[in-house]
Amino acid sequence: MTVSAALQQSADEAGLLPSHQARLDYRTGKGWSTAGVANGFVQGNLAIIPERYAGAFHRFCQLNPKPCPIIGMSDPGNPHIPALGADLDIRTDVPRYRVWRDGEMVEEPTDLLAHWRDDLVTFVLGCSFSFEEALMADGLPIRHIEQGCRVPMYRTNIACTPSGQFAGPMVVSMRPFKPAQAIRAVQITTRFPAVHGAPVHLGLPEQIGIADINTPDYGDPVPVGTDEIPVFWACGVTPQAVIAAAKLPFAITHAPGLMLITDLRNKDLAVL
Amino acid sequence: MTVSAALQQSADEAGLLPSHQARLDYRTGKGWSTAGVANGFVQGNLAIIPERYAGAFHRFCQLNPKPCPIIGMSDPGNPHIPALGADLDIRTDVPRYRVWRDGEMVEEPTDLLAHWRDDLVTFVLGCSFSFEEALMADGLPIRHIEQGCRVPMYRTNIACTPSGQFAGPMVVSMRPFKPAQAIRAVQITTRFPAVHGAPVHLGLPEQIGIADINTPDYGDPVPVGTDEIPVFWACGVTPQAVIAAAKLPFAITHAPGLMLITDLRNKDLAVL
């Protein structure tokens, strides 16, 4: 039995949502990657910012909703976000965090109990896992999942709209599709504006400043067939890169691939 | 004052819908091309088939809804289709018709009074004029309209699903767009399944059997910029080509660009 299946089974036995059970497991040090855990439930990117900078970051997200779709946020100093999960404690419920000081990642703790401050504001941003589930449910193949690697991501020449010290290029993720599949993927992801929504670009990677599709700036390269076109979505790495570039004295994010699992269901994010 | 503006003015004076007034004008021999006439109202492709073949053609349309979206049809021998227009008479209300015998176009009359038969069934199929209006309303440029020519159309290697003697390749129309515009065009036209709906292909024309984008099989070539990709929609020329290839003893279509103007509004065809 896989870890994922075991978590699911224990959740069923306890009568808890699989998402809630997963958070309890991470809280007590069990489990690791959130890939494939609590399928059907929304996973989120995490950004925890001191209140002094939170207003400008909040505006940055509002101004750049495709890379930074807010699905939940906390009051200052409050580690709970009831709208995203019963009993959710942002200090303990993510498998691994990254602590940033002056733009440098200085630590990767498994909880924030030693780092928590009364001025911290938590932002939870939508993640492509949700729309990938919808694409796969429609029968569309996701290349990096087939290949067992990370999605390729690229810095583009598309400038985000700046807010205060938060500024920088949009980072995009890429999934190759045959043309008819690409059209279907536009339709499906359009239904999910809370998790990056429709693609921002397709074909012609050089038009958005991608010189070599085989050399992603983040993640792993995947092959693009001669009968396929690359399709690009705004990516949740954008806010992480922007936070690092802003060189805040202090900030926290999740570690890549180790997300916050919420009690929201992916299907409930569909606008139609 | 243009003919179109004059028609609009006289319609307003008579208290008729502009679409109804346009049909009355065509009925009495006034006016010509339907391009730009009764803006906002649905124009349709026309196929008039003897009842003996109408069942198979109806199934062909049902099996191939993207090139052949039915927006109205008549009872056998009945020249009226009340759902498409008060007072509509299919024998007189289209500016020009094409009469086909054994797959050959033999006449282009301006009415069907001498050709009408009690066994004729009329099919009215959606037309790209409706979705082009929606694209332009969103600010997307339509190249062939900018260039003042006909949309380029191509026979593809996409086989329609056959029904009886009706069979053949899908014909597509092409409009070039920048990638972000192409994504928007997918979204907008998805809202209009009754007028061909979303594109069937984009980029990589050779994948659907188009050897030279600059040599359309119908219509006129238009330039495709190096920063653009060609976007392909199923086209209402498909059923006309299929009807000709079926070599029916007798059939009638509209003459290209001289459509049936209905009282339906384009906006009412939007499914969302």
From Swiss-Prot, chains A, B:
Keywords from the named record: Lyase
InterPro entries associated with the record: D-Glu_cyclase (IPR009906), Putative_hydro-lyase (IPR038021), UPF0317 (IPR016938)
Protein's UniProt keywords contain Lyase: yes
One Pfam family, short name: D-Glu_cyclase
Lyase among keywords: yes
EC number per UniProt: 4.2.1.-
First-level EC class: lyase
Any one GO MF annotation of this record: lyase activity
HAMAP family: Hydro_lyase
NCBIfam families, alphabetized: PRK05463.1
Annotated family: Belongs to the D-glutamate cyclase family.
Protein name, UniProt field: Putative hydro-lyase BRADO2538
Species this chain originates from: Bradyrhizobium sp. (strain ORS 278)
